[in-house]
């Protein structure tokens, strides 16, 4: 898959369907008891609200003409009670739906984050990380209005419409029909606006994603930006990206707010129609109290209809983000446990590649029939030109990718037939880009073994010669490091990652150019620790340092997706082949220095 750049809009692979809304119910279900209680409270509030206009009708048509003070007293009591009940119910509603909505958002956010943890490298390699981040944070938050207010309020408004219609029909069925006369006009307005609004919000979500991706990329590459004095050019690019987002936002909002005034106008016209019909008596004969009560009910009818219209706006907006969220959730991990996968037994360290072929893209083989056997405890140095397939070999061994054909065996077990967790938990992988998490140094070293004691952590650091520099820091092992270890030198980050790998006590150790950025003095300090780290473990090392390569049990020279040469340093030097030429070129370079 070609990489999706920050300025490329992401096309939806599947169009939105009602099934997306049904999927929300999975997250709603755990809170159904609270929802039922809230709905009962809302029904009670609606009934209490509807009592007001009916009491007004009684007072105007009966109580005042008859000067019945006792009746007026009890009506006043009932009215006050209904107002208090309505207030208490509304207070409960606000608190309840906010809690339910935020809990649902929390569950969705947790679910998408957990899913992202299982996706393969290829997913993250093919799109800007900013576009992934926005789906976990911004898009989920955009659903807040829908889930914290929309769904519950929708049901509340529907109940309100039903209860209101019940009271209206009870008072005058014919006048009720007049009240509904303009509903078809509302339906036409909704159908006209719907498609345009959805498309506008799809464009808006794309522009928001693009802007977020560019911000993330710019911050990650700020050192390069400042080194090449690209601040002004980047500012101009961001200004244009930001303007595109603003234009998309304004267009979406303009379309969205076409619905609200339309509903308001229909509500006003309905009120005028009721007055006109009531006064002229077209098919109805109503009292003054009935007409006034009915006008109150018309307001109570159209207010929730207006709210439903606003909910529809929120729904259109939310579905745009739901499309993106569920699109991510529907990405199936390429690498996952096969049915009935077994747990990997304790690893001894024997490794076999049997006629392994692999390709990232169809028709372009990266590995072409790789065959080798490695005994437990051997250290293998993988050397060769860039792009030859060295990193691919270790990625396949850790099963970060699945092979296209052949077999990879660890102690005779096919790596595709055992669980990923049981396999990877017994391997130590140090990738080319040493990653240090924000937090303390001791937390970073403990990352590979969460139950490790402080004594175990210090012992591991001493082995790889990290203890001295850590102890020299102000807070020692409890020194806070920034994201990606930006406050540490490259060599210090490497030493911490070595300690982390040693603490995990892997039986197979993979080092992807792990020592390439360590200075000469640090490398000398590290050498003894590295030897102890490799002792008793099967190891695969991608490195360009002659000292590391020469000390390996065997060397595999990889080129054009094949193992061109294999043997010890002495054996390969005697062949005067690929490795000999590589060694001589590096040796001559060192001599020149």
Question: PLM features: what roles do these ranges have?
Answer:
Residues 22-25, 33-54, 58, 75, ...:
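Alpha-helical segments in transporter systems
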Residues 82-101, 148, 152-159, 178-204, ...:
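Alpha-helical transmembrane segments of multi-pass membrane proteins
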Residues 30, 34-45, 77-82, 86-88, ...:
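Transmembrane helices of ABC transporter permease
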Residues 65-74, 167-181, 251, 255-324, ...:
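Helix-loop-helix
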Residues 25, 32-33, 121-122, 138-147, ...:
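An intracellular "coupling" helix at the cytosolic face of ABC transporter transmembrane type-1 domains
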Residues 1-49, 64-75, 92-97, 101, ...:
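Membrane-integrated ABC transporters
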Residues 20, 28, 93, 97-101, ...:
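Juxtamembrane loop-to-helix connectors within ABC transporter transmembrane domains
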Residues 337-338, 344-593:
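ABC-type nucleotide-binding domain
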């Amino acid at each position: 898959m070609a990489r999706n750049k920050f300025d490329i809009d992401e096309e939806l692979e599947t169009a939105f369907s009602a099934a997306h809304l049904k999927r929300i119910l999975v997250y709603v279900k755990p809170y159904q008891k609270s929802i039922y209680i809230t709905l009962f409270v809302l029904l009670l509030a609606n009934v209490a609200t509807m009592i007001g206009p009916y009491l007004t009708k009684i007072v105007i048509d009966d109580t005042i003409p008859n000067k019945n003070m006792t009746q007026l007293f009890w009506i006043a009591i009932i009215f006050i009670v209904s107002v208090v009940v309505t207030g208490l119910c509304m207070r409960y509603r606000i608190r309840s739906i906010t809690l339910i909505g935020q809990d649902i958002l929390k569950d969705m956010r947790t679910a998408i984050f957990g899913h992202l943890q299982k996706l393969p490298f290829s997913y993250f390699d093919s799109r800007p990380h900013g576009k992934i981040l926005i789906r976990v944070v911004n898009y989920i938050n955009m659903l807040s209005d829908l889930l914290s207010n929309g769904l519950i309020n929708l049901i509340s408004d529907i109940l309100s419409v039903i209860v209101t219609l019940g009271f209206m029909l009870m008072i005058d069925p014919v006048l009720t029909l007049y009240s509904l006369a303009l509903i078809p006009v509302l339906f036409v307005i909704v159908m006209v606006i719907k498609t345009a609004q959805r498309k506008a919000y799809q464009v808006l979500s794309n522009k928001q994603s693009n802007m977020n991706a560019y911000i993330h990329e710019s911050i990650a590459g700020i050192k390069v930006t400042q080194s090449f004095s690209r601040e002004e050019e980047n500012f101009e690019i961001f200004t244009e990206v930001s303007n595109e987002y603003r234009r998309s936002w304004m267009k979406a909002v303009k379309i969205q707010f076409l619905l609200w005034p339309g509903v308001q106008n229909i509500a006003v016209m309905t009120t005028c129609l009721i007055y006109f019909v009531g006064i002229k008596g077209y098919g109805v004969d109503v009292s003054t109290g009935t007409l006034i009560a009915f006008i109150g009910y018309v307001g109570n009818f159209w207010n929730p209809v207006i709210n439903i219209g606003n909910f529809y706006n929120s729904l259109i907006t939310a579905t745009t983000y739901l499309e993106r969220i569920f699109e991510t959730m529907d990405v199936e991990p390429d690498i996952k446990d096969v049915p009935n996968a077994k747990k990997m037994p304790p690893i001894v360290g024997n490794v076999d590649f049997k006629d392994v072929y692999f390709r990232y893209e169809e028709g372009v083989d990266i590995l072409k029939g790789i065959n080798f056997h490695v005994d437990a405890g051997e250290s293998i140095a993988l050397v060769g030109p860039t792009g030859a397939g060295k990193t691919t070999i270790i990625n396949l061994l850790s099963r970060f990718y699945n092979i296209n054909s052949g077999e990879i065996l660890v102690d005779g077990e096919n790596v595709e037939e055992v669980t990923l967790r049981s396999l990877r938990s017994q391997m130590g992988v140090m990738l080319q880009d040493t990653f240090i998490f924000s937090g303390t140094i001791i937390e970073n070293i403990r990352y590979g073994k969460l139950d490790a004691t402080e004594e175990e952590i210090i012992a591991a650091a001493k082995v790889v010669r990290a203890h001295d520099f850590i102890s020299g820091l102000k807070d020692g092992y409890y020194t806070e490091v920034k994201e990606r270890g930006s406050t540490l030198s490259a060599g210090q980050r490497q030493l911490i990652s070595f300690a982390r790998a040693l603490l995990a006590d892997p039986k197979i150790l993979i080092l992807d150019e792990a020592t390439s950025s360590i200075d000469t003095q640090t490398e000398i300090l590290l050498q003894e620790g590295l030897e102890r780290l490799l002792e008793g473990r099967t190891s695969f090392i991608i490195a360009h340092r002659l000292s590391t390569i020469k000390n390996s049990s065997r060397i595999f020279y990889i080129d054009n997706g094949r193992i061109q040469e294999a043997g010890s340093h002495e054996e390969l030097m005697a062949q005067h082949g690929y490795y000999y030429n590589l060694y001589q070129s590096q040796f001559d370079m060192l001599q020149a220095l």
